[in-house]
C-alpha cells in the first residue's frame, strides 16, 4: 500500500483549523490568493499542501508590513501563494527575488500574480538556490534584504542559513518553514514516526538545535502551519 502523508500542519483538530481559517484568514484573503489556492488544489491534489496555508500567508503578510520591508528574498516558490502574499504586502517600490528550479509550478500561479497587478515586483529565477545565492555574495554590489523566506529542501537549510546571514541585513529576518515537521519533532522514538518522514525529521531537529545555539540570531518558533522559525539577525 502506498504511503499517505498525514495532514500537513501541527494543528490536529480539523474543526479548530477551519474555525481559524473562517474567522480570521478567509475573510481578508485577497481574491487572487483565493483563486491561486483553489487552482493549486485542483492541479496538485494532496500535494497542494506544499503551499503555505492561508493563516500562515496572512501572518507573513502582516509581519512584512510591520517591518516596513521593501526588499525580500524567497527560496522555494511552488505555485507562488507565499510569493503573491509577499508581493501584495510590499509597497509599490518593493521587490521580491524568488528562486525555484520548477518553472512549471510557478506558471500555475503566474496568471493570478498578473491579475493582482504585482508581477513587476517579482524577479523569478529558475534555478537551484545555492549557486544564485553564491552569485549574489560574489557580486560587488551585494544585495541587502530586509526579509527572507525559506521553504525548500530541508537538507539544505543549514547551508542556506550561512548564505542568508550575509545577505539579510542586521535587524532583518530570515523565516524558515516546516520547522515542526508535522509535529513529529516531538516524538521520542523513531518507531513513532512514519519511515518516509524520518530522515527529514532528523534534519529538521538538528537544524532547530543549531538555530537555538546560534548567537548571531534571535529566534522565535511560531506554531502556525507546519511551524515557522523567525531568525532576527543580530550581527
From Swiss-Prot:
S-adenosyl-L-methionine binds at residues 52, 74, 76-77, 82, 100, 129, 153. Its EC number is 2.1.1.104. SUPFAM superfamilies: S-adenosyl-L-methionine-dependent methyltransferases. Pathway: Aromatic compound metabolism; phenylpropanoid biosynthesis. Binds 1 divalent metal cation per subunit. Substrate binds at residues 8, 151. Keywords: Lignin biosynthesis, Metal-binding, Methyltransferase, S-adenosyl-L-methionine, Transferase. Its cofactor is a divalent metal cation. A divalent metal cation binds at residues 151, 177-178. Belongs to the class I-like SAM-binding methyltransferase superfamily. Cation-dependent O-methyltransferase family. CCoAMT subfamily. Methylates caffeoyl-CoA to feruloyl-CoA and 5-hydroxyferuloyl-CoA to sinapoyl-CoA. Plays a role in the synthesis of feruloylated polysaccharides. Involved in the reinforcement of the plant cell wall. Also involved in the responding to wounding or pathogen challenge by the increased formation of cell wall-bound ferulic acid polymers. This is Caffeoyl-CoA O-methyltransferase. It comes from Populus kitakamiensis. The lineage of its organism: Eukaryota, Viridiplantae, Streptophyta, Embryophyta, Tracheophyta.
Amino acid at each position: 500500500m502506498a504511503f499517505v502523508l498525514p495532514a500537513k500542519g501541527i494543528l490536529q483538530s480539523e474543526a479548530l483549523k477551519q474555525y481559524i481559517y473562517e474567522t480570521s484568514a478567509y475573510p481578508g484573503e485577497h481574491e487572487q490568493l483565493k483563486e491561486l489556492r483553489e487552482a493549486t488544489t485542483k492541479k496538485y491534489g494532496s500535494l497542494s499542501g506544499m503551499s503555505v496555508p492561508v493563516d500562515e500567508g496572512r501572518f507573513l503578510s502582516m509581519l512584512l508590513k510591520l517591518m516596513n520591508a521593501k526588499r525580500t528574498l524567497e527560496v522555494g516558490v511552488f505555485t507562488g501563494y507565499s510569493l503573491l502574499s509577499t508581493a501584495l504586502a510590499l509597497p509599490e517600490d518593493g521587490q521580491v527575488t524568488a528562486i525555484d528550479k520548477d518553472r512549471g509550478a510557478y506558471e500555475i500561479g503566474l496568471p493570478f500574480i498578473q491579475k493582482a497587478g504585482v508581477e513587476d515586483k517579482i524577479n523569478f529565477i529558475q534555478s537551484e538556490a545555492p549557486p544564485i545565492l553564491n552569485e549574489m555574495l560574489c557580486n560587488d554590489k551585494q544585495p541587502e534584504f530586509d526579509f527572507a523566506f525559506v521553504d525548500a529542501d530541508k537538507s539544505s537549510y543549514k547551508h542556506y542559513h550561512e548564505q542568508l546571514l550575509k545577505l539579510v541585513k542586521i535587524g532583518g529576518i530570515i523565516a524558515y518553514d516546516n520547522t515542526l515537521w508535522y509535529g513529529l519533532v516531538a516524538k521520542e522514538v523513531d518507531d513513532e514516526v512514519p519511515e518516509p518522514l524520518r530522515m527529514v525529521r532528523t534534519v529538521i531537529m538538528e537544524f532547530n538545535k543549531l538555530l537555538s545555539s546560534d548567537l548571531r540570531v534571535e529566534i522565535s518558533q511560531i506554531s502556525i502551519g507546519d511551524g515557522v522559525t523567525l531568525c532576527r539577525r543580530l550581527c
